[in-house]
Amino acid sequence: MKEYRVYLERARSRQQDFLYPLIFREYIYGLAYSHNFNRSIFVENGGYDNKYSLLNVKRLITRMYQQNHLIISTNDSNKNPFLVYNKNFYSQIISEGFAIVVEIPFFLQLSSSLEEAEIIKSYKNVRSIHSIFPFLEDKFTYLNYVSDIRIPYPIHLEILVQILRYWVKDVPFFHLLRXFLYDFCNWNCFTSTKKSISTFSKSNPRLFLFLYNFYVCEYESIFLFLRNKSSHLRLKSFSVFFERIFFYAKRKHLVEVFSKDFSYTLPFFKDPNIHYVRYQGKCILASKNVPFLMNKWKHYFIHLWQCFFDVWSQPRTIDINQLSEHSFQLLGYFSNVRLNRSVVRSQMLENTFLIEIVSKKLDIIVPIIPLIRSLAKAKFCNVLGHPISKPVWADSSDFDIIERFLRICRNLSHYYNGSSKKKSLYRIKYILRLSCIKTLACKHKSTVRAFLKRSGSEELLEEFFTEEEEILSLIFPRDSFTLHRFHRNRIWYLDILFSNDLVNDE
């Protein structure tokens, strides 16, 4: 990253950032594959392939600029199936290059913003998705209504490119990016626009996620502006956001033109207790007041997407429910606000009476069915949750096989350790334990019972059910009050940076 910083500082001296030459740097593709940000719990990271060399990248970009290569009919692809493989190969290589190059200037801007805010030491915790749950535990127990909102996809990839243009002023880079996107759309011209965007997001996940985040960031900028104007409270947690020149220009124009209308409109949005949480393409809006204000914000979202971003969304796709009666899904958890009722006997002089106390608690549950579905997809069990062997790993040593299964168990245990009820998590560990035993038995061409009797692997596999206090006992004494308090309460690991499959499957 230091080399990128020096290169971009030299480019800034020419009053603009030049990203186009970075596409032809071979170490860009090595960095993209060695730092795979989209790694999964169930699948190990892949290494850097030598096919992604500088010479191949130059050839692919030259072919992409050629007119005959840009448009390939469906009949040609049917005649020559090798074209399909080549197109996927071209798309994967150049997409990885685009993604890693376009992230560089924004990472440097974020680093400088964090340094100015003097929070660079806590940057790892800021990046953690688990920092959302302490916020939910602290705020949502005082709220009454919640609305699950799925942010709609843009109707065309050109909208994503237009938003990015206001941040980066490198014309050749955008020519190449637009040619790449139109090349992909022409290749998928026999499908609908929505199907084409969905295909692009699956085949080029990192580039699409980066462009999509900018689209969401623009819509959230307008939302946060109105939310701050309509509330007496200010959102201090967004002080490290990037500066958006285009957004401030729109806001200035909006205030000048509609200043009179704002004085009449904003009182309808007075809601100091509204809370907004968003991860990827899903957001949750919660409030303490009556559903009338929630409906106001609901229609505001609909009109914002339709008028400013040309995205069609139906009002019936946004539901408003009571928190005490509705569970919402976020980040691979099922969450709801549970009412705890307790009765206290009180006595005043000679009179005795009962007082019923109702308290709220955020209940976060491990979703057993989606977890089993993910394990079945990774070939650890069938759709009913019955463990099966993993023959693909049978060529590895016994130690490597056990270590792979233990790594998955540790990741799942850390990810779901903050849940209220862990019975589902113990069942998942049991499935992985039997799958590990069956894999070892398959490798040694034996039955499970004979393998366990011969090798005595039961003691070796006990680590699957290692409790959290055994890990914490390395830090605190076993008889300490802190250790017992941690055992009773749930623990959020705020430095978890990997992505959970269930988060992406929501």
UniProtKB/Swiss-Prot annotation:
Keywords: Chloroplast, mRNA processing, Plastid, RNA-binding, tRNA processing. One of its GO terms (biological process) is tRNA processing. The keyword DNA-binding does not apply. Its main location: plastid. InterPro entries: Domain_X (IPR024937), Maturase_MatK (IPR002866), Maturase_MatK_N (IPR024942). GO terms for molecular function: RNA binding. It is found in: Plastid, Chloroplast. GO terms for cellular component: chloroplast. It holds the Pfam family MatK_N. Coiled coil: none annotated. Belongs to the intron maturase 2 family. MatK subfamily. HAMAP family: MatK. Usually encoded in the trnK tRNA gene intron. Probably assists in splicing its own and other chloroplast group II introns. This is Maturase K. The lineage of its organism: Eukaryota, Viridiplantae, Streptophyta, Embryophyta, Tracheophyta.
